Amino acid sequence: MKVYKDIFTNDEVCSDSYIQEDPFGNAEFREIAFEVKSNKRIKGNDDYGIADNSEDAVDGMGADVEHVIDIVDSFQLTSTSLSKKEYSAYVKNFMQRILKHLEEKKPDRVNIFKTKAQPLIKHILTNFDDFEFYMGESLDMEAGLIYSYYKGEEITPRFVYISDGLFEEKY
């Protein structure tokens, strides 16, 4: 299994157990980012056969049950809010940091990043109100943000990751 980690914090943010798709259904963005679909799951309500637990049940589920988004729960992502102005300042700094990283570690990616990043960020800024932003476990604002949005009538969000802000680790 491959786990994707943030290049600046080593936070685990995704894995290859999620099918990667073109971000926002746009193949143009595929060279710079990927999108995965999340699912909801039930967390809690562990019954180890100690008792019948019926006194705690509400509608067939225990009081300690919660519905979670699998990616958020598995990788301990935390939602954060940013104004458009704050996001613009953040993304400018973040893109410069990635560019510097690429110049040092992957110079063959520099031109691709320069040409493909701007249309992706423009799309995010144009649709800014449709996004929720997530941070990795370290809660470091210098790290990459993860972009979440709902596609059409889907009941769970999709998550978009900037590929050059991640590295793969095999387990």
UniProtKB/Swiss-Prot annotation:
A molecular function GO annotation: calcium ion binding
Domain TCTP: 1-171
A GO CC annotation given for this chain: cytoplasm
Top-level division of the source organism's lineage: Eukaryota
Keyword Calcium assigned: yes
Keywords carried by this UniProt record: Calcium, Cytoplasm
Gene3D superfamilies tied to this protein: Metal Binding Protein, Guanine Nucleotide Exchange Factor, Chain A
UniProt main location, coarse: cytoplasm
Signal sequence bounds: none
Localisation: Cytoplasm
UniProt function note: Involved in calcium binding and microtubule stabilization.
Family to which this protein belongs: Belongs to the TCTP family.
Protein's name according to its UniProt entry: Translationally-controlled tumor protein homolog
